[in-house]
Amino acid sequence: MANGRVVQVMGPVVDVEFDRGHLPAIYNAIKIQHKAQSAGERDIDLTVEVATHLGDNLVRTVAMSSTDGLVRGMEAVDTGAAISVPVGAITLGRVFNVLGEPIDLQELGQVDRRDPIHRKAPEFVDQATTVEILETGIKVIDLLAPYIKGGKIGLFGGAGVGKTVTIQELINNIAQEHGGISVFAGVGERTREGNDLYHEMKDAGVLPKTAMVFGQMNEPPGARLRVALTGLTMAEYFRDEEGRDVLLFVDNIFRFTQAGSEVSALLGRMPSAVGYQPTLATEMGQLQERITSTKKGSVTSIQAIYVPADDYTDPAPATTFAHLDATTNLERSIAELGIFPAVDPLASTSRALAPDIVGQEHYDVARSVQKILQRYKELQDIIAILGMDELSDDDKQVVGRARRIQRFLSQSFHVAEQFTGNPGQYVPLKETVRSFKEILEGKHDHLPEGAFLYVGTIEEAVEKAKKMA
């Protein structure tokens, strides 16, 4: 292990000088530790990661926590390896930071194995080639944009349309119905939300099946850039060593890009389009290519994607799009109608929505639902100008069914029970397809539209209509 010394501190970027022939490799972790000498000082225990070699035996590093109190001349020790984090059963039910240190005020105990956060993606020969659907119990997702085991799913939406709540519901449903292991990576989001999620999962009893890793908004960009890799490394262990199907939740993948942009600017790289880092596509690819199904198990990733100013052409969401198997688009106009989850049934897509994967019946029902909703969208201008009376009888029927379908796509969430007062619903895929098929066939045209709002199956809508009568 080589020793060096700090020669320059620029916010979260630290330059360290080493002796000739002892330069640490790129991605190596370097420890800077210093005991307080006087009452006003604080102990320093900082890990930095090597980002570039500057020449003249200097390396430029990025700090994983605050650099407050750091001064030139402090000793820095090269650990000789990349940042390594605990993996395995010891991580379940616990909350970690980017370095794999517990932040839930409990002792970690004996760590049997640590894995480096920088690893290669699985080889092509190791990857699985079959496509299997992952049932979520959320009607609009299962019907119109089904998720794939081992796939990458993007949850798109602007501020405040329900990305985090939808992610919380998915964690809950997968844990309760499938008994699956989840890893949650909180990347650059609100600490309050992370705290709420921890307590909600504890109360719901799903925490023992979940590992949580946080690098939140208040942390330096180095931590926010690497925390997604920490979570992914924990998930990969369960896939590769235990052959499990793991869910990796990333909230929010945009903050990963944003942190990369900050680090890139601090390292002095020339910015690219809209001020993003020139290495945007490479960084995203290195993360996303590790998320896949192998012959042993799978890592299915659900990533919340903040869309800056609702602009889908922004380089950050646009780069992420290229890696996704399914997209769930949350739309503000649907949220304003009071319909949650506010999923846009026409903009959300999945490559699994094909007859040879989901079956002919499911495919036909899903496409018919989209066809009716698309026709309703086209008629809205006419309705706004001339009113419903000017429509043909066929179009009036389409509008009536579309409005019922639109409301039936809403659903009460388990994680929102305390706010809404409505018990959450998990709707099996078979029930979802059957219920929508009945609406399409016109069996329930006589029921009031309000009966379809926040119910699970079609039978619940019929019961609700009786109560409303």
Swiss-Prot record:
Key words, A-Z: ATP synthesis, ATP-binding, Cell membrane, CF(1), Hydrogen ion transport, Ion transport, Membrane, Nucleotide-binding, Translocase, Transport
Localization (cell): Cell membrane
Catalytic reaction list: ATP + H2O + 4 H(+)(in) = ADP + phosphate + 5 H(+)(out)
Signal sequence annotation: none
SUPFAM superfamilies (alphabetical): C-terminal domain of alpha and beta subunits of F1 ATP synthase (SSF47917), N-terminal domain of alpha and beta subunits of F1 ATP synthase (SSF50615), P-loop containing nucleoside triphosphate hydrolases (SSF52540)
Record's bilayer topology term: Peripheral membrane protein
Enzyme class (EC, first level): translocase
InterPro entries according to UniProt: AAA+_ATPase, ATP-synt_VA_C, ATP_synth_F1_bsu, ATPase_a/bsu_AS, ATPase_alpha/beta_chains, ATPase_F1/V1/A1_a/bsu_N, ATPase_F1/V1/A1_a/bsu_N_sf, ATPase_F1/V1/A1_a/bsu_nucl-bd
Gene3D superfamilies, sorted: 2.40.10.170, Bovine Mitochondrial F1-atpase, Atp Synthase Beta Chain, Chain D, domain 3, P-loop containing nucleotide triphosphate hydrolases
Record text on subunit structure and interactions: F-type ATPases have 2 components, CF(1) - the catalytic core - and CF(0) - the membrane proton channel. CF(1) has five subunits: alpha(3), beta(3), gamma(1), delta(1), epsilon(1). CF(0) has three main subunits: a(1), b(2) and c(9-12). The alpha and beta chains form an alternating ring which encloses part of the gamma chain. CF(1) is attached to CF(0) by a central stalk formed by the gamma and epsilon chains, while a peripheral stalk is formed by the delta and b chains.
Function noted in UniProt: Produces ATP from ADP in the presence of a proton gradient across the membrane. The catalytic sites are hosted primarily by the beta subunits.
Protein name from the UniProt record: ATP synthase subunit beta
Organism phylogeny: Bacteria, Bacillati, Bacillota, Bacilli, Bacillales
